[in-house]
Amino acid sequence: MKLAEKLAAMSNEQATKEEVVTNEIVNFFVEKFETGEMMDAFEKSLGKQEICLRKKSIYLEFWIYVPGCFGTYFGLLGKEWKPENDHDYEHKGVNLKNIYKDVLHEIAELTKENFEEEGFEVKILPNEKNKRFETYVIEISW
């Protein structure tokens, strides 16, 4: 076990339930960036017009369960983290409605850092158009 992993495990033992769940969700996206899945998904999502404009907007979302439609999840570039029961608002005893803003903020910052490391310019904006669920628009330009 690497030292960072050992220390993370020790920290998680001391963390609150909310911190543990927040870390689990954010680490899901950390792993997707580390394996290159996010950059691959971004590249595949580009159309001719976006390439010409040198800009693409992606969406970081928190969906709340809607009966008959969608389950609860955090999503970015087609990658979705879902709780134990995606027809619920809780994961490991934590109400996701109480932590989603912190989780979205951390994922947005993670996204910004990773795209900037690849040489992109990044702006993070709240999505004012969609009132049904929480969304950030992340503008990526090159």
Q: Which stretches of residues belong to each language-model region?
A:
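N-terminal leader/targeting segments
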Residues: 1-105
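Short amphipathic alpha-helix segments
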Residues: 108-113
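C-terminal edge-of-domain segments
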Residues: 114-142
